[in-house]
Design a protein with these regions (language model features):
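Short, well-ordered beta-strand micro-motif
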Residues: 29, 109-113, 130
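Nudix hydrolase/Nudix homology domain
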Residues: 45-46, 117-164
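Acidic, metal-coordinating catalytic segment for phosphate/diphosphate chemistry
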Residues: 1-26, 100
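Residue-level detector of high-confidence beta-strand sites
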Residues: 39, 84-86, 122
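Active-site segment of metal-dependent pyrophosphate-handling enzymes
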Residues: 74-118
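Conserved Nudix-box catalytic region and its N-terminal flanking loop in Nudix hydrolases
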Residues: 31-71, 75
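Structural detector for helix-capping/boundary residues
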Residues: 25, 52, 66, 79, ...
Length: 164
């Protein structure tokens, strides 16, 4: 869904650029060689995990599935989404957009090891896709993604759900 068709856009029409609290999801698509898919954001040129805000009536899983498909063309089923963490602390996940909008996001983080399709940037939100090793993420890295990749690394080492 295009941003101008989204719930967040409609909310922004009412509140302007003021701080908005927003639930959402991020997805770490991981290949067998352990590399994770990142996309390059069209708005600020940073690299990030596919992610987005929830729509009314949607779930965290539905948000993850929809955002992954919209931003990369990759399809994943709900049964293949593994929740591995939650990113909610304000200093880790408050985003200041180039437009002046400010959003404190609360994201459930998912790992996907099974999916269909090849990643293709949508040209609207993302301009490039790349699989990278966890220790070699490209610069500049979107700050919430840096935290999410740290949580993923901890999850992969411990198997325990991660919270930040």
């Amino acid at each position: 869904m295009a941003y101008k068709d989204s719930y967040l856009w409609r909310l922004r029409q009412a509140v302007g650029s003021d701080l908005v609290l927003m639930p959402g999801a991020m997805v770490a698509v991981q290949r067998e060689d352990q590399r994770v898919l990142l996309t390059k954001r069209a708005d600020d040129g940073t690299w990030c995990l596919p992610a987005g805000a929830a729509e009314p009536g949607g779930s965290f899983a539905r948000t993850a599935i929809d955002e992954l498909a919209e931003e990369t063309g990759i399809e994943v089923s709900e049964r293949d989404l593994i929740p591995f963490g939650c990113l909610s602390e304000a200093e880790a996940h408050t985003i200041h957009y180039p437009s002046g909008d400010v959003t404190h996001c609360f994201a459930l983080l998912f790992l996907a090891r099974a999916w269909r399709g090849d990643p293709v940037p949508d040209g609207d939100e993302s301009t490039e896709t790349r699989f990278v090793s966890l220790g070699e993420a490209p610069d500049p890295l979107h700050p919430p993604t840096a935290h999410a990749l740290d949580l993923l690394s901890s999850y992969l080492g411990s198997g325990a759900f991660q919270v930040h």
